[in-house]
Amino acid sequence: MPPEADGPQVLIAGAGPVGLTLAHELTRRRVRVRVIDRADGPATTSRALAVHPRTLEACHQMGLADALVARGRPVVHFTVHLRGRQLIRFDTNYGRLPTAYPFSLMLDQVRTEEILRERLAGLGVGIEWGVELADCAPCGDRVNAELRRDGRSEQVTVPWLVGADGSRSTVRERLGLRLVGDATQTWLNADVVLDADLSRDSNHLVHTGSGTVLLVPFPDPGKWRAVDTGYAGQGADPETVRRRLAGSLARGLGRPVAVSEPTWVSVFRVQQRMITAMRSGRCFVAGDAAHVHSPASGQGMNTGMQDAYNLAWKLADVVRGHAREELLDTYAAERIPVGGRLLSSTRTATALVALRNAVAPVAMPVGLSFLKAVRPLKRRVEHRIMAGMSGLALHYADSPLTYGTGDGAAGVHPGHLVACTEQDVARHPGLRALRQALTDPRWLLLLFADDGGAAELALRYGRAVQIRTVIPHEDEDGPALADPDDALRQTLGVPPGGWALIRPDGYLAAKGQRSGTTTLTARLQALHLLPEDTAPGAGDSAGRPAPDGTRRGVTTE
């Protein structure tokens, strides 16, 4: 049977951070969604803890970052301990990197999900708990799915399906997609209260003699996540875990440590697996359904949310008739390489965190003392740590949506994130205006000179592309961006009179010298965008009027 005319356009299986991010971004772009989850209700255990700068930049565009930061704890250091000695304290303040969030935010997943659910509720979207996706099959221009609730079965047909249903994904299984990789060490997570006199703006790696314990601070006073990498099946009941952690931390810190009984314990195999395809027909997978990682670098939830953020704008553009379906092929083309690079980096991080080497207790003090003494070398190591952990080094330079390499050119290179430090945003009006413009869910085309073509482009592409002229003075009554000190143009590395095209997720797609409307139109079409006169429908994909009431193609601010 065909999908219902006014039914959901996208069915999302899974109401964790990935599914909620996807639902939020699709709804923000006026795509109708239905969100289901097999669980009876929201999770109550902490699970993922870190939200890194790249994810916070995305959350700023979503309008969520302030709420997350208000509830979380910033961490800007990484400290290593052995036998009562503090061997080294790495500075992981990301202030030298292009971000307004120069820290990793410690906020347990329960609260992250709460914030996303609250915002979704404000957009009129609820979660259907206790509803399991039992089966699914892509069928041409639709997806047939079987849902189960309280033993009853419901057959549904939807235009699109996304599996954000975790590492045991039903969607992945039904599509015949396999996670490939390995599972090696067994670790233990425990949420505990410590009396240990440790700085709470730092993560702490404590070498215990037989392994390591990684300590990550919660926002709550005295509460820590303890990751025991030396666990070997000694028992996972609360009292056994408490005694083991107290003994291990006392050996590593060289002093008694009071440890509470844990409020949550999880024993798990460290997995490093991913799939080689993220789409089958009109079905997609994202997050843990597509890749599972070691928790050593705290990237799992962040990568999943960024999967969802990448997919959402592309799917919305296609569903609403603003782009050809070929745009969706770029989801896997961009995100699979990211997953592969992350597997490689987390293998390294896992080895460094676990330190399962007989010579580590001897080699660590020598190596880290040398590193601490050679300041330029220490700064290089810190920069590498920050680039990897922050997510800001992630780029799409090889994407089909990226034009030009930017080799040797100044400013942001095509395929790289457009972001600025908080200080630069405060100092330069043009960068402040850019930051605000990036909260619009459309593409952003900046024209650093207007030869009269902006209005024509807006009429043809304004529903999908925010088109803004950049001028050297304030434009109180108009939509132009003011760049009085030329900082915006120089930051982007755009030639005088040129242009820059920024994707809805904040990455620079292309830039160049202005050579008329024809060139820009060709570039937009090469990115699979459809002009209004060829788009299948004036509003959404069903041909209804635009729900915001705007006239066709007219850019709104």
UniProtKB/Swiss-Prot annotation:
Reactions performed catalytically: 6-methylpretetramide + NADPH + O2 + 2 H(+) = 4-hydroxy-6-methylpretetramide + NADP(+) + H2O; 4-hydroxy-6-methylpretetramide + NADPH + O2 = 4-dedimethylamino-4-oxo-anhydrotetracycline + NADP(+) + H2O
Region of interest called Disordered, as start-end residue ranges on this chain: 530-557
EC number: 1.14.13.232, 1.14.13.233
Name of one Pfam family that matches: FAD_binding_3
Residues where FAD binds: 9-38, 278-288
Record's keyword terms, sorted: Antibiotic biosynthesis, FAD, Flavoprotein, Monooxygenase, NADP, Oxidoreductase
Recorded metabolic or biological pathway in which this protein acts: Antibiotic biosynthesis; oxytetracycline biosynthesis
SUPFAM superfamilies: FAD/NAD(P)-binding domain
Listed cofactors: FAD
Knocked-out gene: effects: Cells lacking this gene are unable to produce the tetracycline intermediate anhydrotetracycline (ATC).
Keyword Flavoprotein part of the UniProt annotation: yes
GO biological process, one term: antibiotic biosynthetic process
GO MF term list: FAD binding; oxidoreductase activity, acting on paired donors, with incorporation or reduction of molecular oxygen, NAD(P)H as one donor, and incorporation of one atom of oxygen
Family: Belongs to the PheA/TfdB FAD monooxygenase family.
Further remarks about this protein from its record: The OxyL-catalyzed conversion of 6-methylpretetramide to 4-keto-anhydrotetracycline is incomplete, either due to low protein expression levels and/or the slow reaction kinetics. Consequently, the biosynthetic intermediate 4-hydroxyl-6-methylpretetramide can be subjected to actions of endogenous enzymes that are not associated with the pathway and lead to formation of shunt products.
Protein name: 6-methylpretetramide 4-monooxygenase
Taxonomic placement: Bacteria, Bacillati, Actinomycetota, Actinomycetes, Kitasatosporales
